[in-house]
Amino acid sequence: MSTGEGTAEQTATGTPAQNGRESIPSDAIREEYENLSDLIRKYRFAYYQDDAPLVSDAEFDTLFRRLEEIEALHPELVANDSPTQEVGGEASAAFAAVEHLQRMYSLEDVFSIEELEAWLNRAEASIAKLGDGTAQAAWLTELKIDGLAVNLLYRDGKLVRAATRGDGTTGEDITHNVLTIKEIPQQLSGEGYPSEVEVRGEVFIPSKAFAEFNEALIEAGKAPLANPRNAAAGSLRQKDPAETAKRPLKMFVHGIGAREGLEARSQSETYALLKEWGLPVSPYFEVLEARADVLGFISKYGEQRHKLLHEIDGIVIKVDDFATQRALGYTTRVPRWAVAYKYPPEEVHTKLLDIQVNVGRTGRVTPFGMMEPVKVAGSTVEMATLHNQDVVKAKGVKIGDIVVLRKAGDVIPEIVGPVLALRDQQDPPVRDFVMPTECPACGTPLAPAKEGDVDIRCPNGKSCPSQLRERVFHLAGRGGFDIEALGWEAAIALTQPAEPDVPPLTSEAALFDLTREDLADVKIRREKRSKGVATGEYELVPYFYSKGTAKSPSKPTASTEKLFKELDKAKSQPLWRVLVALSIRHVGPRASRALAQAFGTMDGIRAASEEELAHVDGVGPTIAAALKEWFAEDWHREIVDRWAAAGVRMEDERDESTPRTLEGLTVVVTGSLPNFSRDEAKEAILVRGGKASGSVSKNTSYVVAGESAGTKLDKAEQLGIRVLDEDGFRLLLDGGPAAVGDAAEADGGDAPEESAALQEEKAAAVEETA
């Protein structure tokens, strides 16, 4: 997946440049922004945590770039939890979480030679301003391996830990599995290695080895693996290292993170040292000074990409000199000294067999294409979203068409359009897609939520099984109750099983009342496989219980037992997670935290007036109205009441001993603080009544700047906003504005009141829990 697969070394932070003319976002823009944020988080989770992409790189990149475009025009929408402010995915709960000594960054992506040249122009202009104005760059140019980013930690030459990248700050401890990869030395060789060093690289499965491994799986009657990247990621997440050892994994290292006592001056010099220490370094890199040579490198490997040792999804271009890298610095997500060029997407032709629709958790109806399975860019694709009926019309596709399917960036499927020259040759003849007028799941008439909406929705939130399935899947997510055993297939089994006729759940209200006996007879339809290959035939299989025999009676599976343990654990989740789990439109993690902080109890939130809700910083009128509308429904209140009766915690334990020193203040933290992680700093602000913002504006009270602070610090200085270091931040936390010499802020005299319009804009920055 793009916008996050490459890694970068060194440390610093900043914020993306905000370009374009600012204006108040319309309701349509706000809704588009919320939907985009929701989709991108969903697709990232599937890619990084499940190793099972739901969409192609092309579609993901398009969605991500549109999100960046909206944020550039409306910077007030940017929140700390925006996908543009995050790196990759979170650490999985299945492995111990470990913090990297130095953050692992993403890379900025460009998708054409024109975009690359524009990036090079900007970088070269910045480099020319350094020193005496005559500096020039040498570019280390290398292949972008399509694998899993891994961080190796060596102490005194001994490998002591290996971790996935995770969110860039915290990854998963996969040391035991990495030890099975023969190319990775457990003890560095040679001399001169640092007493402590993080080595970054990419674990992958060579293309030929992947094909041979899949052939062996099929011969053994097992399902083949989807593609080398997902296979490598899945191999490193095996609970049994012996299983990992069976996979043909390799690794190439491409940089370093934290280190003690290393005097390397450049990326290429570091590669030479890594090789001397016995680490596997890719042979596919060159240090180039002329731009024409960089473009020649791209052209050369573009022609050879399917003949290489491993799959690639682009070319990485880095400034070779470390001093120049440090001078150029970082944004919050990417280095300014490196870029990933993505090759034009591979395209294939396949038949569009049907266009079906899916009903989401807020009733939104989305068409998607079902195609003859076809292999493109290393994986088999048979589905691709078509977003809405207007997109279907704009693409001009008809059911039965031969269509152009591509994977831009080499990883999410996109239907580009029909092959018109073949349309008249199709048998049976092609036919138009007609958007249904009734919900395919419950039969309720469909309609736009309001006049002029492109999307149509099913208004039957209470009884629509598709909406219930999607809500149950959502509430179990990492932002909600975090129930790992309640995945997509389990949500289907609970809400839409093949048997019995009445599902275990007809409302999420009953979730915490489930018993093992309720699940004993549940069966789902699962496709039969022959030697690992799908047959197109289906059978009914028990989902929550094992198949019983005369000698071994049916009993709950290990996954079922895990589900009940996690349901019990979920009851003690904090209030904000319960709010997220309720699928209230517009109420995402940011608003939920603000509401929990302001009211402390679910009863307090329910009883609050719309005006009181809107007054909460980070909520505003849109979210306040959505809350009142949601609680006005009897069946919604029943969910809360039954969860509470089952023991779900509906209030937060409030530490009254923590002084509310930041009441009414907005604080922005930028750069690296020695004694606070970003989350710790945010939590310290919130518990003292302040707002932890991700962007600097005239309404910002203070900016806390750590090492390598970026453009947020520049903007604070331009606006005349007080800037504090970590010591000043501690004083502010303990004693409020007066402790740092700001009497006016302490009195509240100069604090501007927020207009209704400003609160409305804040509401739009919250992801739609839809």
Swiss-Prot record:
Residues 744-753 have a biased composition (Acidic residues). Its cofactor is Mg(2+); Mn(2+). The active site is at 144 (n6-amp-lysine intermediate). One of its GO terms (cellular component) is cytosol. CDD domains: BRCT_DNA_ligase_like (cd17748), LIGANc (cd00114). It comes from the Bacteria. Residues 759-770 have a biased composition (Basic and acidic residues). Zn(2+) binds at residues 439, 442, 458, 464. The keyword Aminoacyl-tRNA synthetase does not apply. GO terms for molecular function: DNA ligase (NAD+) activity; metal ion binding. Residues 657-746 form the BRCT domain. Residues 1-18 have a biased composition (Low complexity). Its EC number is 6.5.1.2. It is an enzyme of class 6 (ligase). It catalyses: NAD(+) + (deoxyribonucleotide)n-3'-hydroxyl + 5'-phospho-(deoxyribonucleotide)m = (deoxyribonucleotide)n+m + AMP + beta-nicotinamide D-nucleotide. Belongs to the NAD-dependent DNA ligase family. LigA subfamily. DNA ligase that catalyzes the formation of phosphodiester linkages between 5'-phosphoryl and 3'-hydroxyl groups in double-stranded DNA using NAD as a coenzyme and as the energy source for the reaction. It is essential for DNA replication and repair of damaged DNA. This is DNA ligase 1. It comes from Pseudarthrobacter chlorophenolicus (strain ATCC 700700 / DSM 12829 / CIP 107037 / JCM 12360 / KCTC 9906 / NCIMB 13794 / A6) (Arthrobacter chlorophenolicus). The lineage of its organism: Bacteria, Bacillati, Actinomycetota, Actinomycetes, Micrococcales.
